[in-house]
Amino acid sequence: AIEWISTSKYSTKERYEKEFDNNGKKSYQNYLERNIIERKLLELDSKLVKRTKVAVITGYGSQKYILQTMVKQHSFKHIEVDVDTVDAFQGSQKDIILYSTVRSSGNKYGIGFLKSEARINVAFSRARCLLIIVGDMKFLDNYKIRGNKFPEIIKYITESEGCRIIEK
């Protein structure tokens, strides 16, 4: 099953990424996505009865840092949570994957390496039971960006049984 929790209907101030310098490289954080993932993890922990392996993954080191910090603030009873970047997660699998897309801005072409097919493949093929995507669906649903796979992914989710889109 696939679930997309879209941030598109939040204000730009809330949903837009923040840019950081990470050892001379640009990196991005998105606190709205962090907060949504925190609520989702708490919800999963309260609903699940069997110990479940969960991973929270993102393409950005700065986002990984704020997600790890948040996860450390909780002691979950029923979920075992790992946080990592998509690149570091290659080869691993978990029952549930939460994927933070991070990118959302006034630059409608600014999706960076989110359009990398290899990264999308890793992010979307590691969940045994449930993939939860958290991000600005309207921003990523842009056919004009060459190589952008998100419009196809969004179409698949909207047309497939067992998949759903959640909006504010």
Question: Which residue ranges define each predicted feature?
Answer:
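Short, glycine-/Ser/Thr-/acidic-enriched flexible segments
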Residues: 9-10, 61-63, 88, 103-104, ...
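A short beta-strand element within the Helicase C-terminal
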Residues: 84, 88-104, 122, 130-134
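Conserved RecA-like helicase motor-core motifs
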Residues: 52-55, 72-86
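Switch/connector loops and helix/strand junctions flanking conserved nucleotide-binding motifs
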Residues: 13-15, 65-66, 92-94, 106-110, ...
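Conserved helicase/translocase motor-coupling segment
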Residues: 1-70
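Feature representing long, continuous alpha-helical segments
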Residues: 34-39, 61, 65, 69, ...
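Helicase C-terminal subdomain and adjacent C-terminal extension
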Residues: 71-73, 106-168
